[in-house]
Amino acid sequence: MDYVDFFKKDHFAMDAGIELKEAKPGYAVACVNVIEKHLNAGGVVQGGLLFTLADLAIAAAANAHGLLAFSIQSDIRFLSSGYLNDILTATATEILLHKTVCHYID
């Protein structure tokens, strides 16, 4: 199965302009070009876009194992801001694969 094509059905991420560049078991890369609709009132990227970008990368890495997977917990720390015309990239890397739970760093 081509997981990049599969995740084109993620309408929320696609409507946000997020593109899945690569997906294989335990690893995925997603990108977004920041446009005006992604900015909050302060002129920086809305945190929801950043979370959605990371979530798509993690979902692709987890689901590329061939079983339908869902996240049970996520948290994010914003280390810097994104701005208009930036290209933002999220890379999900599996750090632990267990029978029922996987852990990813993004």
State the predicted function of each range.
Residues 1-105:
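Terminal targeting signals and extreme-terminal segments of soluble enzymes
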